[in-house]
């Protein structure tokens, strides 16, 4: 019963575009055909970032039409954030597995069996400490790139998404450079900023 409640149609609908099209299924279809030599450089920032980017983009475009479907999408947004909190907290020895489960149940609204399975999946597989954070970091990078290039009219949605997938698994900063026609030099440095640099006290 918990599994049925936790995977109801409104929650499940919100994961379809992450896992299938335009998410991982489309991603894997394209990466098996274009520049396949790059697949060995795959990282969760690119793989999971792509799928989460679509969750964000479809929310922005009003994909969820009913209140129930909006709740389903927001549930997964909360879930992604909670994963970052409990994963990093566990690896920093700030939370136990049971506390991670309780967080998902009490703060996010997971069924307890589903929360237990989620925590087990996170800690008994090969996921690294930053795997869960990579979803959101990669997704936010792609979303920012979409705003820079598509929402300003420099590229169409179709050209933007096709180009990303056809480049296969490379760092998102490299995708950014290629799409913006920046020259890559040996000393090229990323200019992403996820924080504000402390002010100088000189």
Model-derived segments and spans:
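Long, His/Glu/Asp-enriched segments that create or flank divalent metal/ion-associated functional microenvironments
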Residues: 1-202
């Amino acid at each position: 019963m918990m599994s049925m409640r936790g995977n109801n149609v409104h929650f499940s609908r919100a994961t379809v575009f992450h896992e299938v099209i335009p998410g991982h299924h489309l991603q894997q279809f394209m990466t098996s055909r274009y520049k396949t030599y790059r697949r060995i450089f795959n990282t969760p920032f690119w793989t999971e970032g792509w799928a989460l980017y679509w969750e964000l983009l479809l929310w922005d475009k009003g994909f969820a039409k009913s209140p129930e479907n909006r709740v389903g999408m927001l549930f997964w947004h909360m879930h992604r954030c909670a994963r970052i909190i409990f994963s990093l907290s566990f690896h920093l020895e700030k939370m136990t597995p049971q506390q991670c489960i309780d967080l998902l149940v009490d703060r996010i609204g997971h069924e307890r069996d589903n929360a237990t399975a989620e925590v087990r999946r996170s800690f008994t597989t090969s996921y690294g400490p930053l795997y869960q954070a990579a979803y959101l970091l990669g997704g936010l990078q792609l979303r920012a790139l979409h705003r820079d290039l598509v929402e300003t009219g420099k590229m169409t949605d179709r050209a933007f998404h096709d180009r990303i997938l056809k480049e296969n698994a490379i760092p998102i900063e490299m995708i950014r450079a290629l799409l913006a026609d920046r020259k890559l030099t040996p000393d090229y440095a990323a200019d992403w900023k996820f924080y504000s640099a402390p002010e100088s006290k000189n």
